[in-house]
Amino acid sequence: MVAVCIVFIFMNGESLGIKRLSAKPQYESKLFNQDKVHQIDIRIDDWDEFLENSYDEEYWKCDVVIDGEDFYNVGLRIKGNSSKRLVHDYGLQRYNLKLEFDHYQDQYYHGLDQLSLDGSFQDNSYMKTWLTFDMMRYMQVPTPLCSYTWVTVNGKDWGLFLAMEEIEESFALRNYGKDHGKLYKPDYKSLDDENADVALRYTGDEFYKYDNIFRNAQFDINDEDKKRLINSLKILSEGENLEEAIDINEVLRYFTVQVFVVNLDNYLGKTGHNYFLYEEDGKLQILPWDYNLAFTTYSLGMPNPINDAELYVNYPIDTPSSGEIMMKRPLYHNVMKNDTYFNQYHEYFDKLISEYFESGYFKEFITETYEMIESYVEKDPTAFCTYEEFQVAVETLYEFCDLRAQSIRGQLEGTLPSTIKEQSENPNRIDASSVWLPDLGELKDLED
């Protein structure tokens, strides 16, 4: 009788409200096995012409060989915003690439619809995205899979890239199941605009006020989807009953890592973009994306660059942006105004610092990664930096993170100031004079 009941539940679980867990997709253990450097050969007739038309963002047909497996009629295009423009302006050709397996025909790479190949622009360590994604996964934030990949074009060496699972249908299926919600990539048309929607601010019920969200929907959406998301933003703006509209646990875990890596080209920075928004049944999650300018290097590309390692090593965890920006970022500001959530945020920080850094895991992770990729970096024909600059960048990244962890430990324990205001009154800091931030990667490197 018990066996019959178990079979009945298994056969009818979803109709009874029980969500069936999906098995891991095959591509997770194949291309995204992180224990080795993979191989991708792009076979395309007009590679030079493809590169010359980088601004078109049109798909070109190619064949791809991934770790010895052939895939035909795959869509290939160049991707990126400022990185694409700057690579072009400096007369280089190492663009970020996107492969779309189902662009021309109904096919997948073992269940994967799309992947991108990141060229480590302004990242001499080759590790900024790799490390941040690992931290996000450690904190149980839904995160794209990634792996190092040696890319060749028509059999000729092109370079070491980071293959990344695109946040599209396959990502949603892997993380949320077949009944998943909606995904958006909020982004502005012009940084000079107010862009309240990118900042997730509620400004009324009219759909047009959220164009920067809705025109960047990853899936088809209807009016009910729009109303549901706008209502979530309304609840967020009111600051009450936030758990009805926000996945509090996920958001706090995300911001723990986000604040650690000091990514100023993201939700907590002036631009407010470079994240994905997931909505299901009226609840929102924020998802990680685009970390080549993390670890403070976004500031090095500004008209008046700030090269202050001590400032960023000690960046305050409780006010990780100026008041002008913070007041316009409700997903952080309104959540942190709740004492329970604020204390939970500190608990997650304690977990990250104690388990990821103080335990020795971080040192081992960086060391193993270096040993895995260093021979590929040494022979990379399109690298943005020299092999020696890569070695220095890895040391710099390690030292920055080690000192940052020490500073945050002090901020959590109250021996170091944890807000901008407190830091203006209290000079105590972790000494970061040994860290030279430009070693992580700056625009000047592109001139060499």
Model regions: which residues?
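Phosphate/dinucleotide-binding and metal-coordinating scaffold of catalytic cores
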Residues: 1-448
